[in-house]
Amino acid sequence: MKAKREALISLFHAIKEEKVDSDIIDLLLLINSIKGIYTTSSCSGRIGILEEPSLGAKPLSRWLIKVHRPMSFEEARDALKRAREGLIFLKSQPPIFHVVAETIENAKLVHEIGLASGFKYTTFKAISSRFLVEINGTEYLTVPLGKDGRIIASDEYLKFAISIGNKMLERGKSKLPRLRDNFEKIKKKLGEDPLFIQLKREILEI
């Protein structure tokens, strides 16, 4: 499948350039090694502080800080010093995986294990002749902190919000081992993709 070849090449080069979240590299390699499915954009979960020019203006927003691990109060305070214009939010988001399946049967399999692994917002839809499964959790947190460079939240409240955000991030990440185990089961059923083995050897040299 041409689309999978392109996706694999992109993934392997991103791994070489250290542009992939390190704690999900093994899981992404596992998913992409399975016949009939592959990933597109994915994230291991993140917490950070986002500045938006106005509500919903995501294309123009910018992260003052964004990490894929628990964030410290000191990191947040330093990042807030860079706030200039727009609304300021603390955001915590769970892991998310976009998995393309060749057939509806494969899409249903991926959808089922996403739900079974605790990712309750897992959905899938048809796109042209393929099916896109979004494996997504419920651990989202958005907290307003200020506007136009002015921080309204007190240090005490900021510490509290960061603590909750970190706990939600860790809760989302705690489901990753179960998701990996379930993809191992799918691999036993669908088999390993020879294209994956070939490109992995050529690009990653392993």
Swiss-Prot record:
InterPro entries: Taw3, tRNA_yW-synthesising, tRNA_yW-synthesising-like_sf. Its EC number is 2.1.1.282. Pfam families: TYW3. It catalyses: 4-demethyl-7-[(3S)-3-amino-3-carboxypropyl]wyosine(37) in tRNA(Phe) + S-adenosyl-L-methionine = 7-[(3S)-3-amino-3-carboxypropyl]wyosine(37) in tRNA(Phe) + S-adenosyl-L-homocysteine + H(+). GO terms for biological process: tRNA methylation; wybutosine biosynthetic process. GO terms for molecular function: tRNA methyltransferase activity. SUPFAM superfamilies: SSo0622-like. Gene3D superfamilies: tRNA wybutosine-synthesizing-like (3.30.1960.10). It comes from the Archaea. Keywords: Methyltransferase, S-adenosyl-L-methionine, Transferase, tRNA processing. HAMAP family: TYW3_archaea. Belongs to the TYW3 family. NCBIfam families: PRK04235.1-2, tRNAMtaseTaw3. PANTHER family: TRNA WYBUTOSINE-SYNTHESIZING PROTEIN 3 (PTHR48418:SF1). S-adenosyl-L-methionine-dependent methyltransferase that acts as a component of the wyosine derivatives biosynthesis pathway. This is tRNA(Phe) 7-((3-amino-3-carboxypropyl)-4-demethylwyosine(37)-N(4))-methyltransferase 2. The lineage of its organism: Archaea, Methanobacteriati, Methanobacteriota, Thermococci, Thermococcales. The gene is taw3-2.
